[in-house]
Amino acid sequence: MNMDKSKYTRNNFHSSLLKQIIIRVDFSNITDLNKFILTIKSTDWIRECFQSYRTIQANNFNMNLSPKVFEDKVIPLSVIETATIHRFYECKIEPVQSDVTLDITDTFTSITIHCNDTYKSINPYIDCISNIVGELFTYDPFTQIQRIAIRKIDGQDFENEDAVYEVFEKDKSANSTLIEGHARLIKKSYTDAYLDTYANIKINLSRSMEVLLENKYRYVLDIDGYIDTSLNILNNCRDKQGIQDILQFRTNEHLFCIFKDNVTKGYLDSGIKDHE
């Protein structure tokens, strides 16, 4: 049902569905990563955000991933190449979440947030990663931003299919659990990739519903919004404020509009009541 949902905003609504957020900025290769990390570690704001630091060897992250996070609680990695990741953890940003990490490599920085019930806002995390990129512009004025992205994964388990559609819009996915004959649904998923010409942002939108044991249902909504070099926006992004504006006002606001389009008005009403 197409209903007006404009009254629901990020300021008056709180979602209980949000499980994980990834904020990521890709850039041209840093010449001396270790020296840049020392610069970051010397700042006051990083010590206000994170308590601990370590290096790890891992495969580079790939943002084009299948939505399995709700079950595994982690983002799976696609193999590209082995890289050193400088990881800041034990996040001190209030309210403290169950697991938040800041990763920096020679080609990207990302913040991964595993959200708990006390999660309130993405803004302090956007501010943190914008500080990183702002320091990078100062450290190396020749740095070129190649991609800016936010990915949000919402999901919940339900007792039955009717309960699913009290939260998620039914017309956003197939309606029947019966395929044909005696065949019954195990899992269905839909992924759309498109360019939103109004916001000038690329979107990967995945919706999946899986039948679990005892005929319970798991629904996952996975929204990835990003801006890359093909959109001719990043060339003018040369400071912290530019990064912050793209993440907060262009990308995150648009992801919230997509989220609203995929959940019911009844659920949005309950979110306002809970928030108040």
Question: Locations of the language-model features?
Answer:
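Long, compositionally biased interface segments
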Residues: K216-E276
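N-terminal low-complexity, intrinsically disordered segments
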Residues: M1-I104, E276
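Hydrophobic alpha-helical segments and helix pairs
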Residues: C91-F137
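Aromatic/basic-lined ligand-recognition segments
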Residues: R10, T82-T101, T105, Q144-D224
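Extended intrinsically disordered, low-complexity coil regions enriched in Ser, Thr, Gly, Ala
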Residues: L33-T55, K120-Q144, L231-T251
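Short glycine-rich, low-complexity/disordered patches
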Residues: Q51-V79, T138-Q156, I179-H182, H254-E276
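A generic structural motif
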Residues: N29, I113-I122, Q156, I227-S230
